[in-house]
Amino acid sequence: MKRIVTIQDFSCVGSCSLTAAIPVLSAAGVECCGIPTALLSNHTGFPTFYSIDLTDELAPISDQLKREHIDFDGVYTGYIASIDQIEHIEEFIRRFRKPGDPLFIDPVMGDNGKMYAALTDDYPERMRKFIEGADIITPNITEACLLTGRSFNPCPTLHETKEMLRELCGFGVKFAVITGFSEKGQLGA
């Protein structure tokens, strides 16, 4: 059985992050190992939330997994609570990702045209560097705009979407999928 490590927050409310990733990957027949970046009362899309930052726990967890000779067949990241955490996760990837293992990055940082309040203004620039070398990234339309420096447009044309995808892949990404936008007159995400 393949073993994937997913590194992202645990949101008590919000059907996202580790609470969504673990059962979905498990149902696909993959052993899913979760490493939490933060414990959140509810996800950061709510007006307010309570958060326990787990940055200081990432290195000891990584060290323990290495001592136990635990291997992974891929890495999947979601919400990363700070630039400092990105640096810890890059070190984790250097230690555990083997050549040929997929790196899947969901560059979670905003929704509805706005960056999450908990993140700093320099976060999108740092995320651009983090996604270099990823096999797949899945930004939503807000995150795609933040990564490419474009103004938010909730309903980009097909041409604009293709331009954004080309820009995203220009950051050294193999494949990019933009999620969560609607077409005028259409429902769905």
Please place each PLM-identified region on the residue numbering.
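Conserved N-terminal subdomain of the carbohydrate kinase-like
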Residues: M1-I105, M109-A117
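Conserved phosphate/ATP/ADP-binding segment of small-molecule kinases
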Residues: A117-A189
